[in-house]
Amino acid sequence: MGLVVFFFLGSAKPTFFPEDTAVAINKIKIEITGLSTVGKYNCSNTFTVKDTVYVNSIKKNTFNTDIKMSNFDCGNKIMTKDLQGTVKVKKFPNSTVCISDIKPIGKNYKCRLNFFITDKTLKYKDFILYNTDDKIQGTLSLKFSDIDLEPPVKMAGLIKVKDDIIINFSLYKN
């Protein structure tokens, strides 16, 4: 009898651990938004990438991507040049986003996020990624001063960029 129970239960798969899930990514969009004394600004960088985000996986549970800072476009050459100067694009041409330990939380995901920009690494332990039909997206609220940068000031102080910035990133699914 014990042998029968062992074979019956021994081949059972535990149901309390969700299956690994692979999400194929084909495009990434990063947007930096903020305010200045003359209004709102929005700078974005969209690029093609072929990669996979593994959810709830022990095998490969890290997603890394490099972001070329010179590819950001603010819709206006002067603003784009100001952003590139502010983030020191000549000294730090790339930023890196590393998402790891990705776990489902309802229909969304919780993860660890490391964002390496200039020579600083910002670490977020329980970062929420929102899952929609066509993309996975997250939002970081931070300050230029968090990464030891000075917001741009132009025209003898008439135009000042506020310290607060929002970074939205979207990982588009295949």
Regions found by a protein language model. Give the residues of each.
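Bacterial N-terminal signal peptides
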Residues: G2-G10
